[in-house]
């Protein structure tokens, strides 16, 4: 259980980078000052994961949004990690270690997936597709995506407050039944795989919320929102 508790921190409690750096990234990506973009911007992130952190802001029209801002040095770190993995996989192949698993092939697949995950525009398109797939659903809610405020390093989506499925006290507070929430999440996952052929491939509790406002299972990403999506038909 101690290991589980430590790994849970990676979902949304990774040490954040300074909020003023996030502001600079947003301004550079959009070409506008923070004051031109938002009525308000909270420099303190409310979630922080391995690739990006999330800030609360209010658009000029009063819409509340969540801003996913990519870490400033993450690209270099990931490329270094990939180089290390490639070296290890090559050595494993040379010594015929786990040949049946194709170590170099696994690394190539990971490299392709992580590069997609790094492009937040790609994540925004995935959000749109999920929203289309679950349109009219009474158990799944997908936050609105704002493409005009999204770039490779910045994703803007509707802010919706919610409770993670592992937060039993939180679920009780909003009147949600844990087993029902689990059933809704499972049903949504099966629809993605069996009906849509397009599914969320990283549905850990940090990427799922139960929303009191919408009385539905809210799929999102504190990391943020649909961190890895695979198409399988």
Can you describe what each PLM-predicted range is?
Residues 217-233:
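Positively charged, low-complexity/disordered segments
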């Amino acid at each position: 259980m101690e290991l589980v508790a430590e790994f849970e921190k990676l979902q949304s409690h990774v040490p954040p980078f300074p909020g003023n750096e996030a502001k600079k990234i947003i301004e550079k990506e959009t070409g506008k000052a923070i004051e031109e973009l938002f009525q308000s911007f909270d420099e303190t992130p409310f979630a922080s994961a391995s690739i990006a952190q999330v800030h609360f802001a209010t658009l000029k029209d009063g819409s509340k949004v969540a801003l996913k801002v990519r870490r400033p040095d993450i690209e270099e770190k990931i490329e270094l990690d990939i180089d290390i993995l490639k070296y290890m996989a090559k050595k494993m192949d040379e010594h015929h270690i786990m040949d049946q698993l194709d170590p170099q092939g696994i690394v190539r697949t990971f490299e392709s997936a992580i590069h997609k995950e790094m492009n937040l525009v790609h994540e925004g398109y995935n959000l749109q597709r999920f929203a289309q797939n679950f349109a009219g659903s009474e158990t799944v809610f997908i936050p609105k995506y704002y493409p005009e405020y999204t770039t490779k390093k910045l994703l803007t989506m509707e802010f919706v407050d919610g409770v993670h499925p592992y937060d039993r006290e939180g679920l009780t507070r909003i009147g949600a039944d844990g087993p029902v929430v689990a059933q809704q999440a499972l049903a949504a996952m099966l629809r993605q795989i069996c009906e849509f052929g397009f599914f969320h491939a990283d549905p850990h509790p940090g990427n799922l919320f139960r929303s009191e406002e919408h009385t539905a299972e809210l799929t999102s990403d504190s990391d943020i929102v649909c961190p890895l999506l695979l198409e399988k038909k």
